[in-house]
Amino acid sequence: MTDVVPDSNAPAYSVSELAFALKRTLETSYAFVRLRGELSKVTHHGNGHVYLTIKDDKSAIDGVVWKGNVRGLGIRPEHGLEVIVTGKITTYPAGSRYQIVIETMEAAGVGALLAQLERLKAKLNAEGLFAPDRKRPLPSMPAVVGVITSPTGAVIRDILHRIRDRWPCQVLVWPCVVQGDAAAGQVSAAIRGFNALTPGGPVPRPDILIVARGGGSVEDLWAFNDEGLARTVAEGTIPLISAVGHETDTTLIDFVSDRRAPTPTAAAEMATPVLAELRALVSDYDRRLNNCGGRAVEERRTRLTSAARGLPRPADLLALAQQRLDLAVRGLPRLDDLTAPAERRFKEAAARLDTALQRNTDIHARDLLKVTARLSPDTLHRQRADAGRRVGDLGRRLDLAARRVPERVAQHARLPALQDRLNAVARRRLERETDRLAGLEKLRQSLNPTRPLELGFALVHKADGGIARSASELASGERVRLQFRQGDRDAVIDGESSGVLPPSAAPAPTRPTPRPKPASSSDQGSLF
C-alpha cells in the first residue's frame, strides 16, 4: 500500500517563475566572471551577433557576443583559439540552458596569438594577397607622400626629418592611434581616405603611403595583424610601405604591403630619392652627352674637310664659261640701240590710233544718242496712247452714229466685229512699230565702231596714223598696221590697186518688199 504524502504549505512555482528565478540567481551570483577555454562552434550571425562555445577537456558552456561588443573584442573569434573572456552568466529560459554573455575577449598567451596569426597568414596567402606579381612599383620621384602614424612621438619626427634632408616634396600626415582595439579601424580608415582622394582635387592625392609605428611587444603590435586591415591594404591603389616595429618584428601588414621597411626612417629613404645624387647623376649624363656629341661633330668635321679637299674650286669650274660669256656680250649690239626706233614708231602709232579712235567714238556716240532719243520708251508710249485715243474717238463716233440712225439697228449689231477689227489694226500698227524699233536697234549695232571688227573685218592704219578708206590711198610696198578685234598686226602692201567699182556698177540696194494690205471685206459697212 502506497504511503500518502501529507499536504504541504510550500507554494507551487510555475515553470516560467522557476526559470526566471534561476536566471536572477545566476546573474546576481555570477555578474562578473573571467573564463578561460578553447573556442568552438563559432558562428558569425547575419545580424552582427557571434554565437560560440567555450570548452576544456571535460566541460563546455555556450556563449554569445552581442553586436555592440564585437568590434571592441580586439581579436576575431575563431574555432580552436584559446582565449580568456569576461562577462556574466545568464540563462535562456525558453530552453533551460545557461550561457555566458561575453563583453571582452583576449588571447590566452602569446602562443595563442601566434597560432592565430599563422592560420590567418595561411588563409590570406591562399587567396593570393601575398603574391609577388601584385606588388606595385614605388614611384621614383614622388610629389606627395602620405604618412599614417601617431601625430606625436619620435616616428613622425624621424620620417619628416629624413624626407626633408633627401627630397623636396609635400608630406600629408593622417593621424591615428597605432595601438589598442581602435588602431586597426583607424589605420584602415586612413588608407581608404587617401585612396579616395581624386587627382587634381583641393587635397593632393599622395603618390606613395607609409604606415609606420615604433617597436613593441606582440600584443602592442597586434592591431597590424588584423584581417580587415590587411584586406584594406590589398584593395588600395596607392603603393604602400609598411614600417611597423623594429627589423625583427613582423606583422600581417608586412606581407600585404608593396614594400616592407625595417624602420620608419628606412621607409622614408625607400619612398624618396636623394636630390643631390640625382643632380650628380644628371650632371654626369650631361657631361657624357656633351663629350659624345663633341667627338661625333669633330669626327664628321674631319671627314667633311677631307672630302672637300678632293673637290675642284667653283671659280675654276666657271672660269672658262665666264670668259666665253664676256666675249659674246662684247659682240652683241646694245639692246637700247635696237629697240629705240621701234619704240618711237610704236608710241607715234599709238598716239595717232588713240586720236582716231576718240574721234570715231565721239561721232558714233552722237549718232547713237539721236537714234536712242527716237527709240525711247516714252516715244513708244506716246504713240500707243495716241492710237488708244484714236480708237476711243472712233468708238464715240460709232455710238453717236448709232443714236442718230435708229433705222440701222441691224448694222449696229456688227459693231463688236468692227471693234475687233479696229483692235487688230492697232495690234498691227504696234507690231510695225516694234519691227521698226528692232531695225533701229540693228542700225545702232551696225553703227558701233567695233562691230565690223567682231564680224571679221579689220581697220587699215597708214604710217601717218590715219585710216585707209580706199585702196588708192595705199602704195605698193607701204607698211601698214591691221587692227583686228583682238590685237594688231603689221603688214606690207603688195601689188597694184584694182580700183573700186563705180557707183553705177555697184549693185543697187534691194528694198524689202512691203507686205500686202489685207483686202477689205465686202461686207464692211461705212463708218458714216
From Swiss-Prot:
GO terms for cellular component: cytoplasm; exodeoxyribonuclease VII complex. It holds the Pfam family Exonuc_VII_L. Residues 486-528 are annotated as: Disordered. One of its GO terms (biological process) is DNA catabolic process. Its EC number is 3.1.11.6. It is found in: Cytoplasm. The keyword Hydrolase applies. It comes from the Bacteria. Residues 504-517 have a biased composition (Pro residues). It catalyses: Exonucleolytic cleavage in either 5'- to 3'- or 3'- to 5'-direction to yield nucleoside 5'-phosphates. Heterooligomer composed of large and small subunits. Bidirectionally degrades single-stranded DNA into large acid-insoluble oligonucleotides, which are then degraded further into small acid-soluble oligonucleotides. NCBIfam families: xseA. Belongs to the XseA family. This is Exodeoxyribonuclease 7 large subunit. It comes from Caulobacter sp. (strain K31). The gene is xseA.
